[in-house]
Amino acid sequence: MDDSASLQLRPFRSGDAEACLDLFRDCVHRVNSRDCTDDQIEAWASPTIELESWRARFDDRFAYVVIENESVVGFTDMTRDGHLDRLFVSDDHQGRGIARRLVERLLSDAAEESIQEITTDASITAKPFFLRMGFSVVREQSVECRGAWLTNYRMRRATHVEAS
């Protein structure tokens, strides 16, 4: 990351939840919309997602944000058993190594906790990134999300493998 001095990776704080939810919705609308229908986007990034339930999903997880100019520009979280749940980077900040840095941090946490592999359910949009990070596809899935069906990919990666 050439401009890493302006980017700060730090643990998620409860006060970050609203910014992360806003970033998630924006990213789904601006980035994932390339691979999803309008109905799928509206269901996935629904305005009915409640902030407190969103915030609670970060509890007891490895969770990080990347900050630039006091704004959240990326975030991720992983369960204590190694399931990478969410990984989103602002559309305006993609291609700067932020997602790679977040995943590398989770891989480090997993290795420290003796978690042998990380799994994720990657969107169509995110699948190429995860492949570049050394993940492999276990299976294609069709999952229901607030009345819409989305395609994603169960992927996994051993924690000790180097990314390409």
Regions found by a protein language model. Name each.
Residues P11-G15, D22-D92, V103-R105, D109, ...:
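Acetyl-CoA-dependent GNAT
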Residues T119-D121, S136-R154:
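Conserved catalytic-core motifs of GNAT/GCN5-like acyltransferases
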Residues A126-K127, R146:
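Short secondary-structure capping/turn micro-motifs that flank functional sites
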Residues F130, F135:
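Conserved active-site tyrosine of GNAT-family acetyltransferases
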Residues G97:
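Conserved G/P- and acidic residue-centered "switch" motifs that form tight phosphate/ATP-binding loops
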Residues A5-Q8:
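Extreme N-terminal starter segment of soluble prokaryotic enzymes
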Residues D2-D3, A148-S164:
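Terminal substrate-recognition subdomain of acyl/acetyltransferases
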